[in-house]
């Protein structure tokens, strides 16, 4: 039996490419899944493809509504929460000297601040269970930096550091917090990246793809 069998798990950013793949694996493992994202048509598609999955449209930029979202999502899962995968995020690329304050703050707020708040309110639920797991999806560029992505790389590096702090705070409460830092993956989000930036990213990959 899978260790994820009947575990209640929230997945944000589920309407995107990586989120879709995460849902597939969790479903195969027998987890109870609440899929969240901004594109309802994609969420409805997930509901058709994966039996028993629950969906809830939510935009993580609404930071003042994240606590309510966690409450509602946990309720949809039967009242308890075993895990959350914080996968939602955005890019808004520009060279540093051209990057507006709004471009900087928007990416930091959505990627970093919202991930913190999702984790914070999920931990409150997990403390009641006396266990839980959080997986934060970051990026390899959060470790290496990248041309035209000062805001995005800072947000992802921040998630790594934040996750280490949260892991230290709650390890003795049987709550594990980890990060996964994927490389460049073709998704709807990365398709929006300027072709010149894509070339720079791909040139740093040994297999050049």
Predicted regions and their residues:
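Substrate-binding pocket helix/loop in short-chain dehydrogenase/reductase
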Residues: 95-96, 103-108, 190, 197, ...
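Conserved glycine-rich cofactor-binding loop
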Residues: 15-16
């Amino acid at each position: 039996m899978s260790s994820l069998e009947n575990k209640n798990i929230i997945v944000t950013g589920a309407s995107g490419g990586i989120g879709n793949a995460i849902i597939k694996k969790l479903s195969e493992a027998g987890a109870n899944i609440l899929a969240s994202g901004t594109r309802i048509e994609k969420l409805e598609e997930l509901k058709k493809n994966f039996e028993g999955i629950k969906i809830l449209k939510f935009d993580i930029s609404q930071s003042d509504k994240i606590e309510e979202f966690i409450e509602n999502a946990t309720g949809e899962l039967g009242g308890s929460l075993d895990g959350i995968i914080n996968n939602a995020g955005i890019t808004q690329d520009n060279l540093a000297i051209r990057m507006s304050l709004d471009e900087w703050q928007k990416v930091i707020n959505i990627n970093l601040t919202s991930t913190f708040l999702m984790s914070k309110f999920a931990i409150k639920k997990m403390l009641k269970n006396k266990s839980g797991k959080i997986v934060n999806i970051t990026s390899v560029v959060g470790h290496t930096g990248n041309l035209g992505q000062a805001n995005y790389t800072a947000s992802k590096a921040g998630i790594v550091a934040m996750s280490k702090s949260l892991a230290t705070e709650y390890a003795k409460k049987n709550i594990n917090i980890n990060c996964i830092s994927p490389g460049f993956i073709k998704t709807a989000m990365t398709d929006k990246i300027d072709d010149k930036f894509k070339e720079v990213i791909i040139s740093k990959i040994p297999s050049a793809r």
